[in-house]
């Protein structure tokens, strides 16, 4: 209720006493309450996953070499180095926990949809969290791993490019790349906290929750949700 409504409720006490009860006393109580910070500002306290930093780094570079060869194009190397520099040692647990949840779901036959800005992270793609390749539009050969990047702005994403065969081995090229900057995810300088949203199958979701409990422990995992309500005047 508003202050005026509360004053009306206590009007039987008289104007001065009602003001004391509704305004003066609550303000006095509020002044007695000390402001405290439950957690130090600007710090994160992520859970621990053994070898998460080493595992993420290994997964990313193994997948990079699998797709783009033993000597991948420099723009890929530069992009991964920038991303990993912002992630390793700070957010590797976030990535590896998501990777483990996605991998377990896929092993059980259920696809996982990643949504939001995580698609702009090449590390997320190389580690198997998302199917969105954030590199510029390009062709890549699944056989000899030769690649050609289109960086003149003529295409917004690889899916729009014409079909083409690899000039090295004659294999049909894979068209890939959606040209999304990493800053969309972690901001300039990697200052944002990563938020990885994953959509699991309704049939599998409870099992994904149990897997999270297995990773971190019963007392370290909780559900966050939204409760929707309707006012009685709009319900018929």
What are these regions (language model features)?
Residues 2-14, 153, 191-198, 222-225:
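Short beta-alpha connecting loops at secondary-structure transitions
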Residues 12, 28, 32-35, 128-132, ...:
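Short, well-ordered loop/turn and helix-capping segments at boundaries between secondary-structure elements
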Residues 105, 109-131, 213-236:
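Conserved phosphate/anionic-ligand binding catalytic regions in large, soluble enzymes, centered on
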Residues 136-142, 189-194:
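Interdomain boundary/hinge elements
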Residues 11-111, 153, 159-163, 169-191, ...:
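Non-catalytic structural connector segments
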